[in-house]
A protein has these predicted regions:
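Gly/Ser/Thr-rich phosphate-binding loop
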Residues: 1-2, 105
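Short loop/turn motifs at secondary-structure junctions and domain boundaries
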Residues: 7-10, 54-55, 155-158, 182
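AMP-binding/adenylate-forming catalytic core of the ANL superfamily
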Residues: 18, 62-152, 159, 164
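Conserved ATP-binding/catalytic segment of the ANL
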Residues: 10, 17-83, 100
Length: 193
């Protein structure tokens, strides 16, 4: 019962739905019971949500279910980029293709409010030529529709790590801090287009 690209089927004791905006929501059957039994802990709330309001909990993840009930994660809601054409793109999609090439150790797709996407790249090996890097980007782009292709890229001068504050301890990119650190280079990247 596996399907390539999916995280599997939803466990039998859980109910999942996809909201109108694509967010995965989990039905918490235990929440009304929890609220009843923790009234003292929640007494400072100005209003206690009804059980109907509490049952569906947003996860912050975007995803979809296929016809056979397999769940696919498409990215994090807070990471969605909206291009100047109004296209919503989960950056994790092109990032996963870039990382899958083996040429890149890290990739962060940028382009919120822009006509085209770009990427900040950390190569897996030092000294790769621009031609090799572009070939990796081109290869990833072949699997993407035009609106999600990487049209511009730049190399980061160091990996994104907890030591420099650009990643969490478990390796998640701190996107806002990375954008801030590379703001001048990103502006130049888009100024030349």
């Amino acid at each position: 019962n596996e399907r390539i690209g999916s995280v599997g089927k939803v466990l039998g004791n859980r109910i999942v739905r996809i909201s109108k905006d694509g967010e995965i929501e989990n039905k918490n059957m235990d929440l009304p019971h929890y609220l009843e039994n923790t009234a003292g802990l929640t007494s400072n709330l100005t209003s206690t949500p009804s059980s109907a309001e509490c049952e569906w909990l947003p996860t912050g993840d975007l995803g979809h279910l296929d016809d056979d009930g397999f769940l696919y994660l498409d990215g994090r809601k807070k990471n969605v980029l909206i291009t100047s054409f109004g296209r919503n793109i989960s950056p994790e999609w092109p990032e996963s293709l870039l990382l899958g090439s083996g040429l890149f150790r890290q990739a962060m797709v940028i382009g919120d409010g822009q006509a085209q996407l770009g990427a900040l790249l950390v190569t897996a090996k030092e000294g790769l030529s621009d031609e090799v890097i572009q070939a990796g980007v081109t290869s990833a782009n072949q699997e993407l529709p035009d609106y999600a292709q990487i049209k511009h890229w730049l190399l980061a001068d160091e990996p994104f790590s907890p030591n420099n504050g650009l990643a969490t301890a478990n390796g998640r990119l701190k996107r806002d801090l990375i954008k801030k650190k590379f703001n001048d280079q990103i502006e130049l990247l888009y100024a030349n287009t």
